[in-house]
């Protein structure tokens, strides 16, 4: 994972959800802070560990969740930031 790729994943996802303007990216730290309002603050952190990469999601006043993949992390983030949004899948075929 590069800082640019991290920024592309996070900013592209939040732009698709219509909330990109609420995000402050720290590419060098592989983290971002999303502030929708004073009660909805979420931090997303990407880390490389000896056993593999992990995504940490910290919601204000909630227990941190840890995910082994970007897909799982984005699903969890969607449930926090867009709980009423319909969930779908994209299938790429060749």
Model-identified regions with their sequence ranges:
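Generic low-polarity alpha-helical segments
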Residues: 21, 42-43, 73-77
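Low-complexity, intrinsically disordered/propeptide-like segments
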Residues: 9, 17, 39, 77-80, ...
């Amino acid at each position: 994972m590069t800082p640019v790729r991290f920024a592309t994943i996070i900013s592209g996802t939040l732009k698709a959800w219509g909330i990109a303007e609420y995000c402050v990216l720290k590419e060098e730290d592989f983290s971002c802070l999303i502030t929708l309002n004073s009660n909805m603050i979420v931090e997303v952190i990407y880390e490389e560990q000896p056993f593999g990469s992990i995504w940490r999601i910290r919601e204000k006043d909630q227990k941190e969740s840890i995910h082994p993949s970007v897909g799982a992390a984005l699903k969890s983030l969607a449930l926090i930031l867009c709980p009423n949004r319909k969930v779908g899948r994209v299938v790429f075929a060749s």
